[in-house]
Curated annotation (Swiss-Prot):
Protein name: Small ribosomal subunit protein uS2c
UniProt similarity note: Belongs to the universal ribosomal protein uS2 family.
Entry superkingdom: Eukaryota
NCBIfam families: rpsB_bact
Lineage: Eukaryota, Viridiplantae, Chlorophyta, core chlorophytes, Trebouxiophyceae
A Pfam family assignment: Ribosomal_S2
Amino acid sequence: MLQKVKLEDMIQSGMHFGHSTREWNPRMAPYIYGERNGRHILDLVQTYYLLNKVLAFLEEQAAQGKTFLFVGTKQQAAPLIAKTALACESFYVNQRWLGGMLTNWRTIQKSLRKLQEYRRAEERGDWNLLKKQEVARKRREKDRLEKYLSGVENMSRLPGVVILIGQTEEIHAVKECRQLGIPTVTLLDSNCDPNLADWFLPANDDSVSALRLILAWFQQAIQTGQLRSLEREAAKKQKIKKTGVKISGNRRTSSITKKRNPASSKI
């Protein structure tokens, strides 16, 4: 069950502080409460309402067995992104977004296979037979691939949902998701465009306290949905075990095969 979201916690985390009034996007006007000392203040009542919708969406997607990709390359967000994604068995990009990460996924998969080959060669001691310069080159390439791709190393197909911590910094990821029709959940500060997000949350995307709180809620919603999915699968298996009937779509197939009557085959 999801932990109750409290408005007080949102205020204490500084979730309501936006950017300078000079940097705002007019499309965020409906989600801005006002301004203070030259800085926009986000309307946390709107944020609270939208947060509950986002959490319900994440839980339902997880219950349907969808996979999630967390994207956040800001320095203050990077460690939180990795921790949250790993906690809910999801994937992440917390360094630089490589162009074509999603739209050219086959090429990315080739890079991942190359990374695995480098690791196996190093473990076998193959590099001991090479010149020092060649070993240094391969190790640099391996380190580069690990830095940028380690969070998607086990992602065998495109994600079901992409969660973007910040929009302006992750605009290339946003464009790729829109091109492929992958639903997005995006944190939007006062300088962002809500028209580029499927599901969004108006919030301070620079505050570590706010990010930690939001990601904890996201994690909990996904884990709750994943638990529902596991429970449903367990119930299906139990039903098959008891009845011997497997339900597939609208058809019911029995796992019990009737013995053929030998007499029926006689002429």
